[in-house]
């Protein structure tokens, strides 16, 4: 269809023009036939001419000309069928032949009815009916519309004018609910369309007076009938668009009831009135009444001011909840909440108050309410505090009352977890005194004050304390210069820590906190000699008690003691720095030759003292001691010596020699060690001689000549000396190598020489001429030259140089000549290209002759030219042009000469052979030339145009060409070349011209012409005379040649061939030169094809033909365009091809075919139109989309182009249902269909006058069932029923579905598939199922209705195998097998069997099948019942019962115990009463009692140890370490009395009571009741048993019992007085004997010391304090060992620790002098003193380690190290000091020589800023030399408390023989003291021992700290002791330390280290015991020990 008429006309016109034929043919024709329809026409005509070309042109008043391509029917008949015409339109048809013949015809097309005619149901009402239609295609004058009733009688008729959009008409005043038929006909002019009929109905009237009666699960509906026709009513109850119930009722009914509805739910009720296929409705929102909430609970969740309200949402819907809170009828708060909220909270309430909560469920305007009560938690008391200042056994608590409501307070006192008091006080109380409870001093108790309100309570806790007691036996343990140690015993009761303070007068110096386990403390950093007050305060919380003591530190020794003689021979002066701290005075001693010369006391303000009248040169010692408070400090010693006297009469003589001096003197008076004679010069000693004091002369040789020597004779005595001085000089030496130089000067001579050796004063230089003196100069000795000026040029002189030293001198001579002067006024007189002429004036002074030289580049041009001394000019000839020469004139005098010079330049020559060329360039000229003769510096080349300089350039001399750029094209230039040499120039000229420029912008254009081309260009640059234009063919053959003047810009070539390619060239001409050609190419336009036509077409195919084009062409391009002008397809064909076909085109589409003729890049085209046949639609599908009265048909659009679709729907019986025409649709909905019915649809595709169709089927969805319900719901089955759809609908069956998809069995109990019910089997118990039912329509092709759904849950099964059993006395455990059901959990209740009181009730998760029920009453029967719950379904109950176990009796409170005031005592017994009420029988009846007895001591416990059984009386009597025992068990008779609480029984403890075990028999190991000790404090507890023996009277291993608190101490009576007196007498006798023995030994010791010590001498070599030792029982010999059995060690250690470690300190004092009598002479040698770190820690000579001597040095074998024996070898260890920087090599040498494999280091290199040991090993893995040994670290393992390193060591002489050494470095030993715990060091020692045992061939193990005695001795002793523990049944710590001190001084240096060894042994033994009890042999012995922490209280060096 050609819709774009105007555009198409233009295309056709162009086509006609382009395809016009060459010859005209006359074609007459006759019209044969013409036919029209609505959209097309058919016209035929006949002609007898041939061939003819016709065109059919037609048009209307609404469209322009359109064309129809005629076809030849036969040889003479033509026809054309115009399509796509407009219906109802008048067309003018014109048939035209190409020769001008034509004919005209007028035809009108038929009008079309409306495309869509329908009843507008939206505008149709009860009394009106509106129809509407779309405009007909084409032209319509009006529409005729008729209305018929159901009897086919015409009722109304109307004419409606044409409209551009929808047209409509409404019929009025019709009857409600009646059926009608409407017809419509389109009219256009005289023509009418066929009529179209539709059916319609008016809408029936709705019901009236709709009424509702709501209930929670039902609604009652009532109404009144409306007017008009009614067939039936349909009642639809909907919920949010979903139908809940849908039912039809008879038209006579006026009410209906809906049941099984949701409470409180809002429904949409619609009552539909149905008549004539239409319906009208009235709807109303209706609501069921809501239900009240369930499980309403009001809880406080432990909160004070809020209540949480929770409830379960009621069935159905709730819009909101109205919640009110009230108290005693008054509403306090109300709120409204919306679901799904099922809880809320009321805040800001009064604590402890009872409230009423009411919840109203509101659904719309309806509501239902429910109430419950709840109480808030009472508030805690506020400001709860305890108060105590002075009470040690009581305190008071105060509080502020809480806010809100409460009833009373409960006061509970706790001792940790033990309740001491539980009482109730009134609400008006605000304090409570906790007294009369015998609380323990210093203990912290916890007090809980509980506020009770109803059954709720709230509590607040605080802590209260009793005041602690002060420490006991506080005393000063030790003191030194800066520290003061105190010790004490722990107080009674409890405390948390100690506060240690130290007062210096009124100033607090130290204030520190210590742990409660501390028993001593050392104050450090104190002032020496000062008196301090130390205070120890016991702290318990913020309460305290203090105890104080005074002590004084040892005064400090003075420092920096110096003794100085101040250069005096008979006096010594001493000074020192005052000692720190407090000093009373200083004691100063002067000692000479071990004799005290003076003993003076000086004031503390003095720090110096002097000694007079001393012997010269003597050595004295000064000793200074500080004294403060009667205590002396350590002594400080310094030495000093007086100065010796000097000699006299010193004489010196050189004997006339320059290298010799002799010295003599008189002997000095006094003591002299020797003389020292020295020769010095300028303060530096050149030679010295040591002369014996008996000799008084000496001589020196090999001295320096001329030197003045200072001669010193020194008298030496010790380090001091006296001196005598004089001086003398040696004879000086001569100078050497005199040199005289004129320095190239004419009036000057310089004299130089080599300095004379030795010393001298200066030089004298004299110059002469022929023996006549001229000048003498004095030259300093530092210089070796001098100058003489104003001499005669060229003259010879004599020079003399003399050396002067004091009164001595020596001389040497030499000669020299001055330089002559040069000539004057040397001038270049004349020059040419080859000549130079010079002149000069004569020189001054003496001249022998002149010499003239000519040089070029410093090379001589001619031989030397000699002239007489009178010559003044010379001329050089035959020289080179332009060359630069140098002319020299020399003045000669003797062998010396002087020169003058001048430079000369010859004139340069011009260049030759100039050539100028443009080389085809338009803007440049190239100039070349040949050089002239001689030298040039450069060339200057210039270009001139018309005598104006254009360019000028300087060219290097080696260049011979130059190019001028940026010149004008085609112009003439003059070129000038200048030769330059120095300042001289020469020039030559020449002429040249540039090439003309080519034209630009050459273009060849065809102006779309087929036979001409025009070439154009732009003017050429520069100078041009004319242009030559050449025309050439494509192969370059010249076709034409023309010339144009310089002003021309284009030229046109005519008569060319179409489509042919040409070339054009243009040349610029100037001065006979041609430019480079400029070229362009052009082509004429090719001709288009003619006679273009369509030869064949089909639905996917089009074929075209044409006549070939004239001229030249390359190919054809053929294009096929879509209607939207997009390219569909293209092809390129050969020029000989005259037809082409297109395949696979789009159906029904109108295409445009264009053929383009190509020649080169030019083309010409022709075109024509053609259409393909349309296609049918695809994938036609019908769908009901879950609707019952509609079908949707959808399809894929038809391929290609089309005009519209025609849709025809048929009923199952073949009758047509509906007919529609649409274009752009792919889906159509048919409405008003029967539910479940099958329909057939035809879809016809139209494109132009062509069409195609396809068929599809569809079935509507059947109506759904309704009223789904469940019945007979059991565990595994149920019945389900529903109501089916109406009978007038189509359906076949029902389908039942469910979720979850279990394998169920569905049974239909009826024979018909349409039956409305099924029975379901195989359900899972307790599972929730969702069932849905659908209606099925059809058999093979089924459709389904919307499902109706319902939920149901089966009942869960009950649990299996419930079994309950007791767990303990207050708990039972129940287990069961869960049911094979779906369930949420269990509902569990536990009741007492006797009272049916619920003790336990809870919901339990489904995952659990085991439950522990606790907090029950012991020994009661309980019934446990369990139900399985699954949502709202509950299983059958399952029950089981059991009895709880018996438990230990409840713990009696602290006040329930034996009262010490209610007892009768004797010396061996205690009589008291026990009441049955002391123990409750709630945990079981008390079966037995026992009495527990304990001796009272300071460490008393509150209750007996939880141990069964306790020791018996016999064990207590025979083992002093046992302090507690029990009696035999006796049966309880408390349960025999109805009122057992008042029953009591008497106990007489210690009276051999039968019930307590009776009299004790040592032969029987049983519990008994023996007599108590006289005058002994006992504490008594009663132990009650609820379970002790089984039925066979066998005792349980773990019986159940409880104890009362121990009574307060009850002391038995004393023995008679006679026994006491006897004991006292015996004690006094023993004391007297002991005093006598002590006196005897003291006297004996004093006598021994008086014999050994001289009275007049003081030794300062070794300071050993005196000590007296008493060793009773040893017969005067010191003990060497003290082995202790392992099983007795802990008791032994406790005895040593008694009385502040008194015995242990005494034992350590016994070791003080062990081994000290041995000699240390080798260590004291002066050569070895520097190798000792400390001067008081020296190795004994007998046990020291010796190194191999080096170079026969007897002291090279010394190192401060000692052999120490072990348990296995005599030399098992080497104890040594930490290496010094100078002894590191010796240390490793010792390790190498002693075959050491293991080194133990127990110190840090630096501790507290002080160097303790040098870092003597490599810091990384790089090897280092230590002497001759090479050491390399192999590995390093760093652990938290020690580090293990491995070293590889070898000798430099034996590199292959290396050895591995392990280095064990313990890093946590504190600077002063011992490690904090024993565990760490024990583990370290065992680690080292393990490595030692794995090195069987190794030598001794080296152990060192800093000094090698304290920590070293502790380590060695501990290693030996641990080995004893592993191999023996005894341990000997004393013997081990004694043995160590025999081999090295001070081993185990401090008492705290000695104590620490005992603690290690104790902890190891404890660990062994614990390991044995745990029966775990792998348990480490150093673990699971509760180690005590230790700190050394004594500063020590180790």
Curated annotation (Swiss-Prot):
Class of enzymatic activity (EC top level): hydrolase
Residue intervals annotated with topology Cytoplasmic: 1644-1997
Membrane spanning residue stretches: 1623-1643
Main location: membrane
Gene Ontology annotations for the cellular component aspect, listed alphabetically: membrane; receptor complex
Tyrosine-protein phosphatase domain ranges (all copies): 1704-1964
Role of this protein: Plays an important role in blood vessel remodeling and angiogenesis. Not necessary for the initial formation of blood vessels, but is essential for their maintenance and remodeling. Can induce dephosphorylation of TEK/TIE2, CDH5/VE-cadherin and KDR/VEGFR-2. Regulates angiopoietin-TIE2 signaling in endothelial cells. Acts as a negative regulator of TIE2, and controls TIE2 driven endothelial cell proliferation, which in turn affects blood vessel remodeling during embryonic development and determines blood vessel size during perinatal growth.
Name of the featured protein: Receptor-type tyrosine-protein phosphatase beta
């Amino acid at each position: 269809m050609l819709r774009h008429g105007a555009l198409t006309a233009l295309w056709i016109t162009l086509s006609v023009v382009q395809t016009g034929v060459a010859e005209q043919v006359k074609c007459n024709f006759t019209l044969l036939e013409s036919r029209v329809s609505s959209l097309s026409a058919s016209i035929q005509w006949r002609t007898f001419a041939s061939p003819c070309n016709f065109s059919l042109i037609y048009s209307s008043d609404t469209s322009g000309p359109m064309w129809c391509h005629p076809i030849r029917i036969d040889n003479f008949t033509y026809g054309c069928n115009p399509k796509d015409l407009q219906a109802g339109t008048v067309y003018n048809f014109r048939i035209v032949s190409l020769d001008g013949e034509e004919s005209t015809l007028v035809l009108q097309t038929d009008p079309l009815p409306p495309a869509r005619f329908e009843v507008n149901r939206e505008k149709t009402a009860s009394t009106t009916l509106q129809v509407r239609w779309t405009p007909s295609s084409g032209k319509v004058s009006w529409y005729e519309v008729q209305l018929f009733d159901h009897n086919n009688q015409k009722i109304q008729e109307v004419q409606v004018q044409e409209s551009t959009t929808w047209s409509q008409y409404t019929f009025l005043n019709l009857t409600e609910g009646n059926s009608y038929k409407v017809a419509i006909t389109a009219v256009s002019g005289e023509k009418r369309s066929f009529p179209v009929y539709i059916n319609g109905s008016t809408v029936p009237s709705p019901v009236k007076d709709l009424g509702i009666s709501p209930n929670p699960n039902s609604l009652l509906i009532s109404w009144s009938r409306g007017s008009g026709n009614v067939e039936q009513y349909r009642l639809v109850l909907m919920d949010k668009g979903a139908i809940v119930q849908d039912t039809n009722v008879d038209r006579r009914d006026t009410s209906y009831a809906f049941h099984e509805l949701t409470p409180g739910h809002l429904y949409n009720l619609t009552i539909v009135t149905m008549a004539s296929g239409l319906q009208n409705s009235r709807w109303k929102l209706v609501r069921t009444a809501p239900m009240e909430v369930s499980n309403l609970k009001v809880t406080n969740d432990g909160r004070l001011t809020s209540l949480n309200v929770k409830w379960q949402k009621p069935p159905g819907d709730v819009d909101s909840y109205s919640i009110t809170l009230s108290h005693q009828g008054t509403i306090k708060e109300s709120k409204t909440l919306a679901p799904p909220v099922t809880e809320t909270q009321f805040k800001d309430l009064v604590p402890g108050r009872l409230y009423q909560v009411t919840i109203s469920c509101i659904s719309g305007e309806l509501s239902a309410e429910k109430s419950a009560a709840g109480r808030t938690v009472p508030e805690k008391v506020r400001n709860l505090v305890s108060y105590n200042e002075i009470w040690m056994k009581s305190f008071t608590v105060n509080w502020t009352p809480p806010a809100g409501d409460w009833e009373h307070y409960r006061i509970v006192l706790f001792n940790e977890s033990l309740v001491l008091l539980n009482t109730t006080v009134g609400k008006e109380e605000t304090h409570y005194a906790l007294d009369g409870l015998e609380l323990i001093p210093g203990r912290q108790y916890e007090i809980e004050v509980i506020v009770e309100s109803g059954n709720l309570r709230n509590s607040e806790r605080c802590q209260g304390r009793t005041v602690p007691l002060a420490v006991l036996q506080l005393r000063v343990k030790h003191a030194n210069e800066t520290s003061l140690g105190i010790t004490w015993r722990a107080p009674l009761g409890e405390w948390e820590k100690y506060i240690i303070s130290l007062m210096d007068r009124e100033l607090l110096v130290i204030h520190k906190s210590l742990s409660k386990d501390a028993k001593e403390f050392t104050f450090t950093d104190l002032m020496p000699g000062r008196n301090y007050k130390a205070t120890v305060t016991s702290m318990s919380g913020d309460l305290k008690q203090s105890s104080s003591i005074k002590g004084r530190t040892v005064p400090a020794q003075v420092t920096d003691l110096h003794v100085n003689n101040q250069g005096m021979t008979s006096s010594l002066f001493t000074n020192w720095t005052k000692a720190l701290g407090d000093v009373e005075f200083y004691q100063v001693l002067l000692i000479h030759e071990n004799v005290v010369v003076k003993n003076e006391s000086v004031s503390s303000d003095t720090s110096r003292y002097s000694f007079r009248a001393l012997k010269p040169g003597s050595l004295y010692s000064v000793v200074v001691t500080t004294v403060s408070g009667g205590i002396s400090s350590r002594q400080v010693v310094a030495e000093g010596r007086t100065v010796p006297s000097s000699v006299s009469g010193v004489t010196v003589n050189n004997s006339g020699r320059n290298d010799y001096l002799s010295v003599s003197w008189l002997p000095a008076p006094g003591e002299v060690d020797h003389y020292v004679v020295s020769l010095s010069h300028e303060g530096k000693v050149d030679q010295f001689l040591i002369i014996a004091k008996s000799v008084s002369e000496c001589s020196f040789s090999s001295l320096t000549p001329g030197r003045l020597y200072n001669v010193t004779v020194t008298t030496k005595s010790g380090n001091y000396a006296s001196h005598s001085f004089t001086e003398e000089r040696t004879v000086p030496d001569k100078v050497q190598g005199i040199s005289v130089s004129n320095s190239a000067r004419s009036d000057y001579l310089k004299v130089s020489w080599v300095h004379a050796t030795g010393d001298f004063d200066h030089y004298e230089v004299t110059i002469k001429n022929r023996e006549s003196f001229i000048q003498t100069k004095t030259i300093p000795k530092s210089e070796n030259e001098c100058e003489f000026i104003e001499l005669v040029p060229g003259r010879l002189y004599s020079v003399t140089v003399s050396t002067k030293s004091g009164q001595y001198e020596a001389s040497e001579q030499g000669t020299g000549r001055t330089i002559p002067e040069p000539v004057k006024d040397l001038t270049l007189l004349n020059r040419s290209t080859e000549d130079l002429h010079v002149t000069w004036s004569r020189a001054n002074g003496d001249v022998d002759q002149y010499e003239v030289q000519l040089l070029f580049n410093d090379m001589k041009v001619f031989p030397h030219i000699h002239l007489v001394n009178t010559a003044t000019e010379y001329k050089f000839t035959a020289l080179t042009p332009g060359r630069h020469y140098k002319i020299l004139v020399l003045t000669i005098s003797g062998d010396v000469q002087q020169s003058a010079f001048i430079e000369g330049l010859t004139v340069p020559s011009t260049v030759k052979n100039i050539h100028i060329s443009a080389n085809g360039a338009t803007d440049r000229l190239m100039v070349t030339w040949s050089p002239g003769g001689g030298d040039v510096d450069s060339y200057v080349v210039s270009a001139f145009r018309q005598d104006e300089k254009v360019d000028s350039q300087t060219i290097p001399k080696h260049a011979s060409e130059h190019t001028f750029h940026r010149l004008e094209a085609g112009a003439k230039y003059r070129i000038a070349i200048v030769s330059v040499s120095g300042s001289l120039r020469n020039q030559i000229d020449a002429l040249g011209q540039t090439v003309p420029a080519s034209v630009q912008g050459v273009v060849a254009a065809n102006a779309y012409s087929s036979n001409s081309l025009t070439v154009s260009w732009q003017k050429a640059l520069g100078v041009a005379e004319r242009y030559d234009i050449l025309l050439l063919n494509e192969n370059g053959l010249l076709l034409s040649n023309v010339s144009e003047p310089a002003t021309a810009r284009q030229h046109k070539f005519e008569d060319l061939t179409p489509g042919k390619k040409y070339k054009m060239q243009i040349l610029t001409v100037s001065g006979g030169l041609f430019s480079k050609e400029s070229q362009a190419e052009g082509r004429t336009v090719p001709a288009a094809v003619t006679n273009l036509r369509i030869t064949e077409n089909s639905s996917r195919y089009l074929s075209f033909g044409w006549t070939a084009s004239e001229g030249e062409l390359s190919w054809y391009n053929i294009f096929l365009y879509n209607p939207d002008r997009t390219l569909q397809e293209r092809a390129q064909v050969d020029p000989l091809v005259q037809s082409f076909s297109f395949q696979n085109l789009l159906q029904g589409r109108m295409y445009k075919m264009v053929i383009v003729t190509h020649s080169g890049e030019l083309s010409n085209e022709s075109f024509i139109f053609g259409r393909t046949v349309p296609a049918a639609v695809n994938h036609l599908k019908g769908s009901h989309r879950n609707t019952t009265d509609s079908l949707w048909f959808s399809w894929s659009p038809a391929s290609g182009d089309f005009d519209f679709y025609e849709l025809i729907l048929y009923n199952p019986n073949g009758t047509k249902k509906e007919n529609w025409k649409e274009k752009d649709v792919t889906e159509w909905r048919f409405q008003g269909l029967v539910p479940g019915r099958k329909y057939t649809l035809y879809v016809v595709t139209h494109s132009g006058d062509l069409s195609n169709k396809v068929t599809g089927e569809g079935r509507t969805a059947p109506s759904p069932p309704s009223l789904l319900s469940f019945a007979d719901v059991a565990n595994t089955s149920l019945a389900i029923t529903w109501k089916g759809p109406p009978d007038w609908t189509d359906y076949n069956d029902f389908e039942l579905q469910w979720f979850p998809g279990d394998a169920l069995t569905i049974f239909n109990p009826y024979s018909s598939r349409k039956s409305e019910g099924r029975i379901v089997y195989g359900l899972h118990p307790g599972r929730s199922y969702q069932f849905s039912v659908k209606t099925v329509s059809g058999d093979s092709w089924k459709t389904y209705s919307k499902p109706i759904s319902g939920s149901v849950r089966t009942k869960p099964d009950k649990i299996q195998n419930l079994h309950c059993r007791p767990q303990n006395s207050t708990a039972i455990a129940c287990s069961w097998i869960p049911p094979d059901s779906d369930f949420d959990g269990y509902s569990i209740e536990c009741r007492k069997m006797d009272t049916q009181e619920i003790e336990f009730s809870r919901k339990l998760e489904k995952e659990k099948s085991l439950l522990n029920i606790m907090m029950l009453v012991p020994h009661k029967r309980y019934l446990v019942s369990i139900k399985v719950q699954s949502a709202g379904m509950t299983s059958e109950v399952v029950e089981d019962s059991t009895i709880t176990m018996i438990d230990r009796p409840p713990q009696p409170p602290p006040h329930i115990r034996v009262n010490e005031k209610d007892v009768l005592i004797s010396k061996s017994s205690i009589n008291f009463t026990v009441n049955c009420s002391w123990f409750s029988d709630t945990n079981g009846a008390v079966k037995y009692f026992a009495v527990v007895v304990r001796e009272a001591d300071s460490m008393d416990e509150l209750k007996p140890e939880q141990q069964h059984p306790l020791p018996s009386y016999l064990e207590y009597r025979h083992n002093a370490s046992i302090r507690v025992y029990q009696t035999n068990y006796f049966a309880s008779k408390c349960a025999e009395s109805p009122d057992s609480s008042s029953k009591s029984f008497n106990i007489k403890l210690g009276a051999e009571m039968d019930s307590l075990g009776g009299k004790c028999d040592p032969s029987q190991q049983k519990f008994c009741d023996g007599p108590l000790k006289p005058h002994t404090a006992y504490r008594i507890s009663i132990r009650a048993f609820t379970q002790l023996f089984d039925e066979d009277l066998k005792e349980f291993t773990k019986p159940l019992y409880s104890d009362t608190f121990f009574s307060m101490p009850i002391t038995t009576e004393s023995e008679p007085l006679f026994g006491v007196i006897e004991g006292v007498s015996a004690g006094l006798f023993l004391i007297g004997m002991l005093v006598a023995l002590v006196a005897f030994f003291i006297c004996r010791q004093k006598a021994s010391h008086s014999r050994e010590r001289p009275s007049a001498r003081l030794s300062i070599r070794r300071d050993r304090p005196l000590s007296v030792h008493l060793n009773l029982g040893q017969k005067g010999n010191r003990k060497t060992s003290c082995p202790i059995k392992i099983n007795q060690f802990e008791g032994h250690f406790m005895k040593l620790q008694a009385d502040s470690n008194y015995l242990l300190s005494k034992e350590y004092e016994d070791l003080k002098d062990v081994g000290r009598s041995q000699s240390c002479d080798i260590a004291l040698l002066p050569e070895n003193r520097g190798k000792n770190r400390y001067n008081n820690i020296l190795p004994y000579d007998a046990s020291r380690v010796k190194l191999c001597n080096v170079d026969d040095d007897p002291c090279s074998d010394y190192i401060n190290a000692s052999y120490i024996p072990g348990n296995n070898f005599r030399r098992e260890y080497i104890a040594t000091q930490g290496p010094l920087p100078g002894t590191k090599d010796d240390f490793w040498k010792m390790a190498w020589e002693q075959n050491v494999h293991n080194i133990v280091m127990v110190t840090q290199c630096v501790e507290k800023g002080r160097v303790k040991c040098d870092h003597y090993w490599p810091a990384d893995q790089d090897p280092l030399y230590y002497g001759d040994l090479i050491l390399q670290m192999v590995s390093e393992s760093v652990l938290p408390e020690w580090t293990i390193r491995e070293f590889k060591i070898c000798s430099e002489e034996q590199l292959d023989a290396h050895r591995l050494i392990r280095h064990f470095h313990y890093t946590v030993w504190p600077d002063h003291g011992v490690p904090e715990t024993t565990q760490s060091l024990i583990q370290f020692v065992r680690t080292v021992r393990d490595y030692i045992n794995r090195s069987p061939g190794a030598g001794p193990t080296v152990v060192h700290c800093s000094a090698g005695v304290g920590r070293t001795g502790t380590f060695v002793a501990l290693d030996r002791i641990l080995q004893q523990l592993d191999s023996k049944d005894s341990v000997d710590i004393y013997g081990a330390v004694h043995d160590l001190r025999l081999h090295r001084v001070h081993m185990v240096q401090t008492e705290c280290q000695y104590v620490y060894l005992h603690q290690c042994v104790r902890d190891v033994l404890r660990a062994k015991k614990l390991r044995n009890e745990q029966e775990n042999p792998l348990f480490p012995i150093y673990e699971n020990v509760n180690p005590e922490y230790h700190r050394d209280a004594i500063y020590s060096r180790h």
